Amino acid sequence: MKFPKRNIDISEYLSEIKALLGDNDCAIFIDTNIISQLYRLNDAARQDFYNWVKSCGDRFHIPVWVIHEYSNKIHHNKTTDYLSELSKIKQYSNDFSNISDFVKGYVGESLLVGSIYQGKVQDLKDEIDAIEDSLKKISTAISKNIAKHQSTVHEEIVKQLEERILDTDIFSIVGNADNIFCQRSNNRIPPGYKDNAKEENRVGDYIIWREILQYCRENNVRKAILITRDMKTDITYFPDNQTVEGYRPAGNTETIRVAKIALYMSSILIPKVTNSKSLISKLLLKFSHHNTKTWHYLSN
C-alpha cells in the first residue's frame, strides 16, 4: 500500500488512456450505465457507438452481471427511467396550461408600461396561447412513439452487443460475494462500498469488479478498461483543484488512482469514430493486471 498521491500529469495520463484504448492487448468492458446511456442518444450517435464497438474487435466485452442488471429494467418495463427528462416536457406543458389563463386575465396596460408589450396586451396574450400550443405539440410528438422507439433501441442493443457478453459462471462469484462485500464495505474498501445501504443489488459493483478480474486472470489479460458513468465516491472523488488526483488504497495488492478531467469521446474514448462528441464524456476505469491488481479511474 502507498500513501495517497495528490497530483499527476493530466496530459500524460490522458495519453496513457488513449494508448490503452488503441492497444490490441487491452480488453474493454462497459458498465450497465453505458447501456442505459444508449437510450439517451439519438440514432446517429448510437450508430457511432456501435461502429466503435466493431472497431474494437474481440477486445470489447460486457460482464454477465451488467446484463442481469439491464434485464431487470426490461422485465419490469422500467426503461423509461433512463429518460426521466422526457416526462418533464408533459409536466411543463400542463403547468404552463394551468397558469396561462390566470396570466392572461391578470395582465393589463398598467402592468406592461415600459416593457416590450406596452400597448400590446393582446399580442402578449396571443404569444402565451402560441407557447401553450407549441408545448402541447412537442409533448404529443415526443410521447406518441416513445414506447416503440425504446423497443427499437433494445432490439439494436441485442443485435449489436449480444455476442459481446462474457460466458462467466456468475454464480461462482455471487455465492460468497455478499459476505466478502460486507467485510470490505464495513472498512470502506472500494469499489462499491457506498452501495452498502441499498435494499437491492448492493453488491452489484463488486460483482462486476470480480467478474472482470476473473476474466483477466483466466485469459491472461494484463491490461483492461472499464467504461462507466458511476460517479459515487467509492469509485471516484472530486478534489477542489481540477488537477488534483490521488490514490485510493484498497489493500496490499489493490490501488485505486483517481483523475478528474473532462474527456471527450471523439478524441479519447472513440478515437476511430468521427462526429462522436454527442456520446458525451464518460468515466473511464483502467485496470492493469500484472503481479498485483491496480485499478485506475478517470472521470469527467
Region locations from a protein language model:
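Active-site-proximal, substrate-binding regions of enzyme catalytic domains
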Residues: 2-224, 232-300
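Cofactor-binding loop segments of dinucleotide-utilizing enzymes, especially the Rossmann-like FAD-
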Residues: 229
